[in-house]
Amino acid sequence: MNEVLNCLLTRRSVKKYLPQPVEQEKLDAVLEAGTYAACGMGRQAGKIVVLQNPDDIAQLERMNAAIFGNPDAHPFYGAPVVCVVFADTNVNTWIEDGSLVIGNMLAAAHSLGVGSCWIHRARQEFELPEGKALMQKWGVGAQYAGVGHCILGYAAAEPAPAKPRKADLIIRA
């Protein structure tokens, strides 16, 4: 099977991570792949903030868990890297552009043997005063909104196999 297709068909969301860090070379490759995502009219609306400090990750995780409605949850599953993807809301394809950044990062991580998962609620996090303060601290302009998180690390357990695809996902008209 073609290497790219194999990567796309075998990638799974990892929801339990080892504490070992992701090597800088691999992390940089995943981030670069994100910057090469397709985007509307080449406007490159996405922006990636990379968190590796456990205290920073814990702060964001607490915010995410509260939005989720379960303050005791650990929605980042112990991942040692959390990448927050923002996009410039002045670009009319900002949601799509930011989503494709995450998609590229997920595929790139898998191709390098790094586990990953898309975590939602970024938009809500950065609409909060605490989130806006973080954006300011990180130098992310107010015109940006959170699209999602791409968590990265090495899987502590083998991800579940893919569910069979629904028969009606493709309609040939």
Segments from the language model and where they lie:
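Acidic, surface-exposed loops and disordered segments
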Residues: 1-173
